[in-house]
Every structure is written in C-alpha cells, then in structure tokens.
C-alpha cells in the first residue's frame, strides 16, 4: 500500500515539476533576450560617447611651437596628415550611425523576439566596425611613424618636436580602439539574440 | 442544388490549396538556408585564396636597386616597415582561420537549421574581419605615404626609387581589401541564416 501511494505521488510530483519548469524556462528566455537588448542599448550609448570623443579629440589636435623663425612658424595640425583627416571623418560617421541606431535598439527592447531590427543592427554594426577599425588601424600606423620614425625609409619621428600633438592623437586612437571593441561586443550580442532558441 | 455543389467544391479546393502550399514553403525555406550555406562555402574558399595571395605577395615584397656605392647597397624589403610585417602576420592568421572554418561551413550545409556552427562562424568571422581590416587600413596608410610622402612631416616618398616594391605592396593591399569585402558578405549571409524564419 505504501508502494501504491508512493508511485502516484512521484509521478504527480514529476508532472507538477515539469509544467512550471517549462513555463519558467520560456519566461527566462524572453527575459534573457530582453536583458541582451537592454545591455545592447547601454553599450551602444557608451560607444556613441567613445566614438564622439575620438573624433572630437583628433579633430582638435593641433600644436603651434612657441618659437618661430623670420619666415616660418612651426605648426602641426591633424589635417596635415590625410590619415588623421580620414580618422576624423570615419569616426564622425560611426558616431552618427550609432546615434541613429539607438531607436532600433529600443525597438529591440520592446519587442525582444522581432528579428527585423536585430538583422538590420547586426549588418550595419558590422559595416560600422569595419570603418572604425580601418580608421583606428591607419591612424595607429601613422602615430607609430610619428613616434619612432623609420630609419629604412628615412622618415624621422616628429614627436620630439610636437609632443602634445602626438599625445592627443594617441589618445584619440585609443578611444577609437575602445569604440571598435564595444562594436565587436554589440555584434556578438546581436548574434546571440538572433539565435532561434 | 448548384449552390450546394459549389460551396463544398470551393472549400475542398481551398483546403487542398493550403496544405501543399505550407509544405512547399517549408521546403523552400530549407532550400534557401542550404543555398545560403553553399554560397557561404564557395565565398569562403574564395576568401582563403585571396587572403593567402595577399599574405604571400606582401611577404615576398623586396627590391634591390641595381646600383650601389662602395659602402652601401640600396634595398627595400617588407620587413623594413613594421606595418607591413603586421600585415603579413595578420593576413596569415586570417587565411589560417578561414581554412579551419571550412569544416564548420560544410556542417552548416549538411544541417542548415543548426544554429551552433552559424553562431560560431558569425562571431569568429567578425573577429577575422576586424583583423583583416586593421591590416589593410594600416598598410594602405603606409603605401600612401611611400607613394606621395608628406610634406608637412617632411617624409619623402620612396616609390620613385623603389617602384616595384610599391607596386607589389599595393597589390597585396588590394587583395586584402577584397578579402575583407568577402568576409563582410559572409557575415551578412550568416546573419540571414541565423534568422528565425
């Protein structure tokens, strides 16, 4: 008799156990996608600030040396180097895109299971990442050259003379690399959110 | 009586119509994902060849000028410029990754609805794209400098002397940009394949 009582008790417990578990797991899935979407929005705001800071820092990089000859004053500005000009333009485009992408990120929070905004975000984020990385890598190549020069090509470093210029440019490059890292993370989040399960 | 006959005939036709339509659409969906996966594999093979060509071209870029002084022979090699060294290493890593990713692409063809390999591919492809773009952009900044020099920083172009060197390096950069474009396309394909529908 104890066995008879036991077996129904067990199966009913199992049945009771599974039903709430499934409900809980679907609830958790929705919450998980929503959590990813909120995380996406927060990271995106951070990326906007970082990309804007990179563009603004590089865009205001110039230095005039305090001494001058009769005919010439020594001055270095970001637009002396085409790579730094490209950097400013590219980072400005990335910042603009990130601001415009905020509404889509909010839509993804409201409707965590909609794939349309996610798909749009992942594709455009990848393009923005490419642009951002190109700007950062090209600028770092030039900053390294300005810092160390290259003896083989007979290019001398200019950071001995224009120290502040180089420091500001380096800061902008670091900011753009951080923005690229955040964008890479955003793409991973979008890919996880696009998954079927 | 004609009305009685018409109505059942219509509904049965509708019922007959819907059932095969649903079956056909699920079949088309599977085929669409399989088609994307096959396209992915073909593009990936193309990217392997392009990335390898970029690495090999840059890695064999050197030029010795046919004249020399008593003490010095003029020579330019890719490893005189750290950016070009980085380019060779980065493109070799990208090629290696692309070769290793081929089995996952084949798994995605065999099981078009599995999200695991797709998710892995999209994340690692994004990392590879970042590396590839960084190498290409940094190299293009240096190639531009070698071609045109920069009067503000007093860096003179070296392509007047080392013409073949510059041409080979430019070719490698072009190949790496093509590889980056293919990788971008692969990510879009993976994102489309990851969609729920």
Curated annotation (Swiss-Prot), chains A, B:
Carbohydrate-modified residues: 150
GO process annotations (BP): cell wall modification; cell-cell junction assembly
Topology with respect to the bilayer: Multi-pass membrane protein
Spans within the Cytoplasmic topological domain: 1-35, 107-119, 193-197
Extracellular side: 57-85, 141-171
Pfam families assigned to the protein according to its UniProt record, in alphabetical order: CASP_dom
Location of the protein in the cell: Cell membrane
Record-annotated membrane-spanning stretches: 36-56, 86-106, 120-140, 172-192
Keyword field: Cell membrane, Cell wall biogenesis/degradation, Glycoprotein, Membrane, Transmembrane, Transmembrane helix
GO cellular component: Casparian strip; plasma membrane
Entry function: Regulates membrane-cell wall junctions and localized cell wall deposition. Required for establishment of the Casparian strip membrane domain (CSD) and the subsequent formation of Casparian strips, a cell wall modification of the root endodermis that determines an apoplastic barrier between the intraorganismal apoplasm and the extraorganismal apoplasm and prevents lateral diffusion.
Protein family (similarity comment): Belongs to the Casparian strip membrane proteins (CASP) family.
NCBIfam families: A_tha_TIGR01569 (TIGR01569)
Subunit structure: Homodimer and heterodimers.
Protein's recorded name: Casparian strip membrane protein 3
């Amino acid at each position: 008799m104890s066995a008879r009582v036991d077996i129904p008790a067990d199966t009913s417990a199992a049945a009771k156990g599974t039903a709430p578990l499934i409900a809980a797991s679907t609830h958790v899935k929705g919450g998980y996608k929503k959590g990813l979407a909120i995380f996406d929005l927060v990271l995106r705001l951070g990326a906007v600030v970082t990309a804007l800071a990179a563009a603004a820092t590089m865009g205001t990089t110039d230095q005039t040396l305090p001494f001058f000859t009769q005919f010439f004053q020594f001055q270095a500005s970001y637009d002396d180097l085409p790579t730094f000009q490209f950097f400013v333009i590219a980072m400005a485009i990335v910042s603009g895109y990130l601001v415009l992408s905020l509404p889509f990120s909010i839509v993804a929070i409201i409707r965590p299971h909609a794939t349309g905004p996610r798909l749009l975000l992942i594709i455009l984020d990848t393009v923005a990442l490419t642009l951002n990385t190109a700007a950062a890598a090209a600028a770092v190549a030039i900053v390294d050259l300005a810092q160390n020069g290259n003896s083989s090509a007979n290019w001398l470093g200019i950071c001995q003379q224009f120290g502040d210029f180089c420091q500001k440019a380096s800061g902008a490059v670091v900011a753009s690399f951080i923005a690229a890292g955040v964008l890479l993370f955003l793409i991973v989040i979008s890919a996880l959110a696009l998954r079927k399960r």
